[in-house]
């Protein structure tokens, strides 16, 4: 009943507000267009009602009313382009975000609670970001409001996508539905992979000015990838060995701790090999720090109760990887000092020496 009331309220708003634009065409009185701005918050309020009722937007004639409301709203925005004094750029960003959330809610509703519903939200944010990349050359509204539609809106979507990655990988995955869970080949892991690629691509190709620091621009996608691969391993243990997806059971599991040690060692090895090949000393130090954490973990956690085969395998594997690192991945040399900085430091040293003599 509440969902039906929300749909009817939205329909009533359309019936009341849209004639104001038609009337404004005749009398050209500016205040007539101002109430039309209420249509967007009414759409948002109706969405909240559906969310509270846990109902899809297509219910209660929503399949007809919501498309009509969005068409009317964007038609009103197009008409308001001719009227001065309206924050149209901000309105377009708010509209796009609300439309994205509406689509995400609708996509997640038919799916049972679990990795499919969680993946639907990530897929929605990812597709919205891709759509902006493809549509940014359109005259309206993207080129007309380029500062907000082509810069601010994608940045918000990148942030939402990163936030979705954190939430989806920290919470319990729920059920995998009727389809058996396949590690790395399930919708949640595949959506995470797509999200990492999109965030990396956006930071380095489409919006390189968002993060000017090179290490941070590589570090953010790298941190998200590290979070995802660890969560993917824990989900694999959760579904295959029936280990509860909680901190205490995972910490107490011999298989989980050995798997994490091997995974971190492989990541550290790959990171250090890549850093040696590219000459990236900071990246090598990150890999070295991860290997040090693995060694510390082996002696404080993994080997605390000796005798299990999983722990012995983990210890031997990590030891072998450390040997590979020592041979194939030596630490890269420091970056050469900037000649101008060297000259300035030399001049400063000479001036200090002359000052000491006097």
Enumerate the predicted regions with their spans:
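Alpha-helical transmembrane segments of multi-pass membrane proteins
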Residues: 1-358
């Amino acid at each position: 009943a509440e969902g039906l009331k929300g749909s009817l309220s939205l329909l009533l708003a359309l019936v009341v507000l849209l004639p104001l634009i038609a009337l404004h065409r005749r009398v050209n009185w500016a205040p007539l267009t101002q109430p039309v701005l209420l249509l967007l918050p009414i759409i948002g309020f109706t969405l909240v009602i559906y969310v509270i009722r846990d109902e899809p937007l297509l219910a209660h004639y929503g399949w007809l009313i919501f498309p009509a409301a969005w068409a009317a709203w964007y038609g009103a925005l197009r008409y308001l382009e001719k009227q001065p004094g309206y924050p149209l750029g901000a309105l377009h960003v708010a509209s796009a975000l609300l439309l994205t959330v509406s689509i995400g809610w609708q996509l997640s509703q038919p799916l049972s609670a679990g990795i499919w519903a969680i993946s639907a939200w990530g897929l929605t944010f990812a597709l919205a970001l891709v759509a902006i990349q493809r549509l940014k050359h359109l005259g309206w509204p993207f080129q007309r409001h380029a500062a907000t539609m082509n810069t601010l809106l994608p940045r918000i979507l990148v942030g939402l996508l990163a936030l979705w990655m954190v939430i989806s990988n920290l919470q319990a995955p729920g059920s995998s539905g009727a389809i058996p869970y396949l590690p790395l080949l399930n919708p949640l892991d595949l959506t995470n992979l797509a999200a990492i690629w999109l965030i990396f691509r956006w930071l380095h190709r489409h919006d390189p000015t968002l993060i000017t620091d090179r290490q941070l621009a590589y570090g953010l996608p790298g941190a998200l990838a590290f979070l995802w691969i660890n969560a993917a391993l824990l989900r694999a243990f959760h579904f295959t060995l029936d280990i509860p997806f909680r901190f205490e059971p995972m910490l107490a599991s011999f298989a989980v701790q050995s798997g994490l040690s091997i995974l971190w060692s492989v990541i550290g090895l790959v990171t250090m090999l890549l850093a040696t090949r590219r000459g990236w000393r900071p990246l090598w130090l990150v890999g070295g720090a991860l290997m040090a954490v693995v060694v510390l973990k082996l002696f404080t956690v993994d080997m605390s109760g000796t005798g299990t085969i999983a722990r012995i395998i983990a210890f031997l594997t990590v030891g072998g990887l450390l040997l590979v690192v020592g041979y194939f991945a030596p630490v890269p040399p420091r970056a050469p000092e900037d000649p101008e900085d060297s000259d300035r430091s030399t001049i400063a040293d000479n001036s200090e020496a002359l000052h000491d003599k006097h």
